[in-house]
Protein backbone atom coordinates (compact mmCIF):
# COMPACT_ATOMS: atom_id res chain seq x y z
CA UNK A 1 0.00 0.00 0.00
CA UNK A 2 1.45 3.38 -0.96
CA UNK A 3 1.87 5.99 1.73
CA UNK A 4 -0.53 8.89 1.45
CA UNK A 5 0.83 10.60 4.57
CA UNK A 6 4.19 9.98 6.19
CA UNK A 7 5.21 11.80 9.37
CA UNK A 8 8.80 11.38 10.48
CA UNK A 9 10.12 12.40 13.93
CA UNK A 10 7.74 15.36 14.28
CA UNK A 11 8.42 17.56 17.30
CA UNK A 12 6.28 20.63 17.97
CA UNK A 13 6.90 23.25 20.60
CA UNK A 14 5.29 26.42 21.87
CA UNK A 15 6.75 29.61 23.30
CA UNK A 16 4.99 31.30 26.19
CA UNK A 17 6.49 34.14 28.22
CA UNK A 18 9.85 33.43 26.62
CA UNK A 19 9.81 29.79 27.75
CA UNK A 20 9.81 26.93 25.25
CA UNK A 21 7.86 23.75 25.89
CA UNK A 22 7.53 20.64 23.75
CA UNK A 23 3.98 19.44 23.03
CA UNK A 24 4.82 16.68 20.54
CA UNK A 25 8.10 14.79 20.81
CA UNK A 26 9.40 12.86 17.77
CA UNK A 27 6.10 11.35 16.62
CA UNK A 28 6.28 9.13 13.55
CA UNK A 29 3.49 7.35 11.71
CA UNK A 30 2.17 6.83 8.22
CA UNK A 31 -1.24 6.44 6.61
CA UNK A 32 -1.70 4.42 3.44
CA UNK A 33 -4.36 5.07 0.82
CA UNK A 34 -7.71 3.76 2.01
CA UNK A 35 -6.37 3.17 5.51
CA UNK A 36 -7.93 4.35 8.77
CA UNK A 37 -5.53 5.33 11.54
CA UNK A 38 -6.46 6.49 15.02
CA UNK A 39 -4.21 8.46 17.34
CA UNK A 40 -5.02 7.49 20.89
CA UNK A 41 -3.76 9.22 24.00
CA UNK A 42 -4.83 11.03 27.10
CA UNK A 43 -5.89 14.66 27.12
CA UNK A 44 -2.94 16.93 26.40
CA UNK A 45 -0.83 14.21 24.79
CA UNK A 46 -0.48 16.07 21.47
CA UNK A 47 -3.08 14.39 19.25
CA UNK A 48 -4.68 17.65 18.10
CA UNK A 49 -1.33 19.43 17.81
CA UNK A 50 -0.09 16.59 15.58
CA UNK A 51 -3.23 16.81 13.43
CA UNK A 52 -3.06 20.62 13.11
CA UNK A 53 0.64 20.39 12.21
CA UNK A 54 -0.16 18.43 9.07
CA UNK A 55 -1.84 21.48 7.51
CA UNK A 56 0.30 24.02 9.38
CA UNK A 57 -2.73 25.39 11.21
CA UNK A 58 -1.03 26.01 14.54
CA UNK A 59 -0.68 29.56 15.93
CA UNK A 60 2.68 30.42 14.38
CA UNK A 61 5.10 31.89 15.47
CA UNK A 62 4.04 30.93 19.01
CA UNK A 63 4.10 27.34 17.77
CA UNK A 64 7.18 26.00 16.02
CA UNK A 65 8.39 22.73 14.56
CA UNK A 66 11.51 21.64 16.38
CA UNK A 67 12.10 18.76 13.98
CA UNK A 68 10.44 16.39 11.60
CA UNK A 69 9.01 15.96 8.14
CA UNK A 70 5.42 15.70 6.97
CA UNK A 71 5.08 14.12 3.53
CA UNK A 72 1.77 14.07 1.68
CA UNK A 73 2.00 12.16 -1.61
CA UNK A 74 5.80 12.39 -1.24
CA UNK A 75 5.75 16.22 -0.98
CA UNK A 76 7.16 17.70 2.23
CA UNK A 77 4.36 19.99 3.46
CA UNK A 78 6.69 21.62 6.00
CA UNK A 79 8.67 23.28 3.19
CA UNK A 80 5.72 24.37 1.05
CA UNK A 81 4.72 28.03 0.69
CA UNK A 82 1.35 29.20 1.99
CA UNK A 83 -0.25 29.43 -1.47
CA UNK A 84 0.50 25.74 -2.07
CA UNK A 85 -0.89 24.77 1.33
CA UNK A 86 -4.09 26.73 0.61
CA UNK A 87 -4.66 24.54 -2.47
CA UNK A 88 -4.25 21.42 -0.30
CA UNK A 89 -6.33 22.53 2.72
CA UNK A 90 -10.00 21.65 2.40
CA UNK A 91 -9.38 20.12 -0.99
CA UNK A 92 -6.86 17.25 -0.91
CA UNK A 93 -6.71 17.16 2.90
CA UNK A 94 -9.78 18.08 4.95
CA UNK A 95 -10.20 18.32 8.68
CA UNK A 96 -13.24 17.94 10.91
CA UNK A 97 -12.46 20.22 13.81
CA UNK A 98 -13.19 19.37 17.42
CA UNK A 99 -15.37 22.38 18.21
CA UNK A 100 -18.18 23.14 15.71
CA UNK A 101 -19.55 25.99 17.82
CA UNK A 102 -16.46 28.09 17.13
CA UNK A 103 -15.51 26.66 13.72
CA UNK A 104 -18.53 27.95 11.79
CA UNK A 105 -18.84 31.65 10.96
CA UNK A 106 -21.81 32.98 12.97
CA UNK A 107 -22.56 35.66 10.34
CA UNK A 108 -22.98 33.40 7.31
CA UNK A 109 -25.67 30.91 6.38
CA UNK A 110 -24.94 27.21 6.29
CA UNK A 111 -25.45 27.27 2.52
CA UNK A 112 -22.85 30.02 2.06
CA UNK A 113 -20.26 28.27 4.20
CA UNK A 114 -20.57 24.86 2.55
CA UNK A 115 -21.14 26.00 -1.04
CA UNK A 116 -18.25 28.48 -0.88
CA UNK A 117 -15.82 25.60 -0.36
CA UNK A 118 -17.29 23.75 -3.33
CA UNK A 119 -17.26 26.80 -5.60
CA UNK A 120 -13.71 27.76 -4.63
CA UNK A 121 -12.09 24.34 -5.05
CA UNK A 122 -14.24 22.79 -7.78
CA UNK A 123 -15.04 25.92 -9.78
CA UNK A 124 -18.76 25.12 -9.87
CA UNK A 125 -21.43 27.74 -10.43
CA UNK A 126 -23.61 28.72 -7.48
CA UNK A 127 -26.66 26.66 -8.50
CA UNK A 128 -24.62 23.48 -8.88
CA UNK A 129 -22.75 24.15 -5.62
CA UNK A 130 -26.09 24.73 -3.87
CA UNK A 131 -27.42 21.38 -5.12
CA UNK A 132 -24.23 19.65 -3.94
CA UNK A 133 -24.51 21.40 -0.56
CA UNK A 134 -28.07 20.12 -0.19
CA UNK A 135 -26.94 16.59 -1.12
CA UNK A 136 -24.12 16.70 1.45
CA UNK A 137 -26.34 18.02 4.25
CA UNK A 138 -28.85 15.26 3.54
CA UNK A 139 -26.05 12.67 3.44
CA UNK A 140 -24.78 13.63 6.91
CA UNK A 141 -28.27 13.44 8.39
CA UNK A 142 -29.44 17.05 8.66
CA UNK A 143 -33.25 16.89 8.93
CA UNK A 144 -35.14 19.22 6.56
CA UNK A 145 -31.85 20.03 4.85
CA UNK A 146 -33.42 22.41 2.34
CA UNK A 147 -34.86 24.56 5.14
CA UNK A 148 -31.51 24.53 6.93
CA UNK A 149 -29.62 26.03 3.97
CA UNK A 150 -30.52 29.59 5.00
CA UNK A 151 -30.01 28.96 8.73
CA UNK A 152 -27.24 30.63 10.68
CA UNK A 153 -25.11 28.38 12.91
CA UNK A 154 -26.80 29.53 16.14
CA UNK A 155 -30.12 28.25 14.78
CA UNK A 156 -28.79 24.67 14.72
CA UNK A 157 -28.19 22.28 17.58
CA UNK A 158 -24.61 21.35 18.46
CA UNK A 159 -25.04 18.00 16.74
CA UNK A 160 -26.38 19.63 13.58
CA UNK A 161 -23.43 22.06 13.54
CA UNK A 162 -21.07 19.09 13.86
CA UNK A 163 -22.81 17.46 10.89
CA UNK A 164 -22.34 20.66 8.87
CA UNK A 165 -18.61 20.52 9.69
CA UNK A 166 -18.52 16.91 8.49
CA UNK A 167 -20.32 17.90 5.26
CA UNK A 168 -17.79 20.69 4.71
CA UNK A 169 -14.89 18.30 5.22
CA UNK A 170 -16.35 15.79 2.75
CA UNK A 171 -17.36 18.42 0.16
CA UNK A 172 -14.32 18.11 -2.10
CA UNK A 173 -13.81 14.37 -1.69
CA UNK A 174 -10.39 14.73 -0.05
CA UNK A 175 -7.62 12.18 -0.33
CA UNK A 176 -7.11 12.44 3.44
CA UNK A 177 -9.72 13.24 6.08
CA UNK A 178 -8.43 14.23 9.52
CA UNK A 179 -11.08 13.93 12.21
CA UNK A 180 -10.22 15.60 15.52
CA UNK A 181 -12.89 14.21 17.86
CA UNK A 182 -15.56 14.55 15.14
CA UNK A 183 -18.43 13.29 17.26
CA UNK A 184 -17.93 15.58 20.26
CA UNK A 185 -21.24 17.39 19.72
CA UNK A 186 -23.26 14.52 18.23
What do these predicted ranges mean?
Residues 114, 166, 186:
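Hydrophobic anchor residue at the start of the ABC signature
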Residues 76, 128-147:
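Conserved ABC ATPase "signature" region
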Residues 177-180:
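Catalytic Walker B motif of ABC-type/P-loop ATPase nucleotide-binding domains
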Residues 65-76:
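Conserved ABC transporter NBD signature motif
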Residues 151-156, 160:
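Conserved ABC ATPase signature
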Residues 171-175:
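A short, proline-enriched helix->beta-strand linker immediately N-terminal to the Walker B motif
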Amino acid sequence: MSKLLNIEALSVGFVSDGQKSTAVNKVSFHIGRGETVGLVGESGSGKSVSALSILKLLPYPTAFHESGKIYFNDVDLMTQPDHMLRSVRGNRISMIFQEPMSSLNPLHSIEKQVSEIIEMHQGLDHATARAETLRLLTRVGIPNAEKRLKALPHELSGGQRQRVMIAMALANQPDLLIADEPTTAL
